[in-house]
Amino acid sequence: FIDEVKPNLDEWGKKQQVDRTLWNKAGDAGILGSSIPEEFGGFGGDLGFDAITLYELGRTAGDSGSWGYAIQSIVVHYINAYGTDEQKKRWLPKLSTGEYVASLAMTEPSTGSDVQAIKTTAEKDGNQYKINGSKIFITNGGSADLIVLAAKTNKNEKSKGVSLVVVETKDLEGFSRGKPLKKLGQKGNDTCELFFEDVKVPLTNLLGSEEGQGFYQLMKQLPWERLA
């Protein structure tokens, strides 16, 4: 697999994005399912499997060699930890095969990574959330089919007002992406802004048993994110 990655690094660096076929090849090779439970299409490894995979990708293919794998594996851990069985059945197999590319959308233009201060909102509208706001510096943002989005479900609260909502982007009205952001390193990892204007997703896309758990969920997973 690495032999297929290396010859393309310069081209991907110039494009600021890897070819989509790479994700499918990574899925075929079993790389994307290292920590996904077997019943959902992976082979049931732990954090150690992901760490070794990241190490090998970086060692053999440089700073563009991970091509967003770290973010994909981070999102897997969120769905594993907080998703319902139905959510896991729906999303994990697609993440394992590379059919879906994932991103975690937390950072915002005006607040950085201060999650308590985010401005993006997800307001209930019947049986849906209506999402408005923007995110910046989002790895895999240009490719993402699935986004774990940090948003305020209660604008009057700080940390207790944050929830994580899964957004599937295909043909999604009101959702748009900015141009790839140029970086000093990790040039093959596409990074961009994301915009949400009255975007609607089902209430069942909430991660966790109730609203307001997002800040805790993010802090709980932060050690793995930093390792990745």
Where are these predicted regions, by residue range?
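Amphipathic, small/basic residue-rich leader segments at the start of a protein or domain
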Residues: F1-A70, A81, E86-R90, K94-T97, ...
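Structural signature of FAD isoalloxazine-binding scaffolds in flavoprotein oxidoreductases
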Residues: G44-E56, D114-I118, F195, V201
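Short Gly/Pro-enriched turn/cap motifs at secondary-structure boundaries
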Residues: G68, L95, S110-S113, F137-N140, ...
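A short core secondary-structure module
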Residues: N132-S176
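Glycine-rich beta->alpha junctions and the first turn(s) of the following alpha-helix
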Residues: L164, F175-A228
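A gly/ser-rich beta-alpha-beta helix-loop segment of oxidoreductase catalytic cores
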Residues: V101-E123
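Short glycine/proline-enriched turns and hinge-like loops at secondary-structure junctions
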Residues: G45-D46, D114-Q116, N140-A144, K158-G161, ...
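Short Ser/Thr-interspersed hydrophobic loop/turn segments at strand-loop and sheet-helix junctions
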Residues: G30, T53-G58, A150-A151, V167-L172, ...
